[in-house]
């Protein structure tokens, strides 16, 4: 392992991601990641929360046109709500759009009774996630004819930015909230790994409007962060020594065939490996740091000791070795005469 690689490979990485729906709803979930290095719970939690609330793409109504209405401060005959109240209700529409947009939806209704989102007519590329949403109430004999303009975007866009230059008379732009994520909260707790108790556990509660699931929303937010941070990496990924230097006759580093007894570890570390049935170095390097720390009586001091010894052989914890163990491992091990 190179010095550069140590900057990230020697940090403990989360190996458990638990996602649990809250109250049987597909819109709310608790997302838990652990263990994290101390301080990383706050760092990742805050970054993910900001991206979830501001940067995910979604669909929303950007403008409406109501038959017989010229501006948003009008009233509609036979409609109990005025136009501003109707607009407030429309802002609550949760939409899923399968195309770029913009698209049109229409609504025609007659009284008496309430008008809901289920009465809106749309193309096959738009879905309404909350059809029970009440838009307005009509009196006896009243009629309502509306047209909605739907677009894609992110975050919050004010009505002034939703008015095109060639907007016709009666075109009423509205504020749009495109984000499919409605609420995000998080907390950081201690996480235990083996004998070490000061790691972080990140717990997030993510609520969406149903157009995207909480699990997918978190995955998208993480992908956005990954893409944004890529620019700051100014070096090529170094190749691990273990992948470059392999024995001519073996499909892997020959040191993997040595027994852990040859590492001259402290009595405590050696006993921990023995109790965990780790015989060969090849068995050892496939263990992650988190797995090692879960070994009884195995602490950070023992972990650092093992990592240092492995590094001297060009090896490290968390390696993936194909076809291990070989069928004739005992015979191969006997052929290695030179001691470490």
UniProtKB/Swiss-Prot annotation:
Q: Name one GO molecular function term.
A: DNA binding
Gene designation per UniProt: rpoA
Keyword Transferase found: yes
Family of the protein in this entry:
Belongs to the RNA polymerase alpha chain family.
Keywords in alphabetical order, please.
DNA-directed RNA polymerase, Nucleotidyltransferase, Transcription, Transferase
Top-down, what is the taxonomic lineage of the species of origin?
Answer: Bacteria, Pseudomonadati, Pseudomonadota, Alphaproteobacteria, Rhodospirillales
- Alpha C-terminal domain (alpha-CTD): where is this region? 252-340
Which chemical reaction does it catalyze? RNA(n) + a ribonucleoside 5'-triphosphate = RNA(n+1) + diphosphate
Annotated domain remarks: The N-terminal domain is essential for RNAP assembly and basal transcription, whereas the C-terminal domain is involved in interaction with transcriptional regulators and with upstream promoter elements.
What this chain does, per the entry, is described as: DNA-dependent RNA polymerase catalyzes the transcription of DNA into RNA using the four ribonucleoside triphosphates as substrates.
Which InterPro entries does UniProt cross-reference here? Answer: DNA-dir_RNA_pol_insert, DNA-dir_RNA_pol_RpoA/D/Rpb3, DNA-dir_RpoA, RBP11-like, RNAP_asu_C, RNApol_insert_sf
Asked if the record carries the keyword Cell membrane, the reply is no
Subunit notes for this chain? Homodimer. The RNAP catalytic core consists of 2 alpha, 1 beta, 1 beta' and 1 omega subunit. When a sigma factor is associated with the core the holoenzyme is formed, which can initiate transcription.
Please name the source species: Rhodospirillum rubrum (strain ATCC 11170 / ATH 1.1.1 / DSM 467 / LMG 4362 / NCIMB 8255 / S1)
- Any Gene Ontology biological process: DNA-templated transcription
Q: What is this protein called?
A: DNA-directed RNA polymerase subunit alpha
Among Pfam families, the record links this protein to: RNA_pol_A_bac (PF01000), RNA_pol_A_CTD (PF03118), RNA_pol_L (PF01193)
Against SMART domains, the record matches this protein to: RPOLD
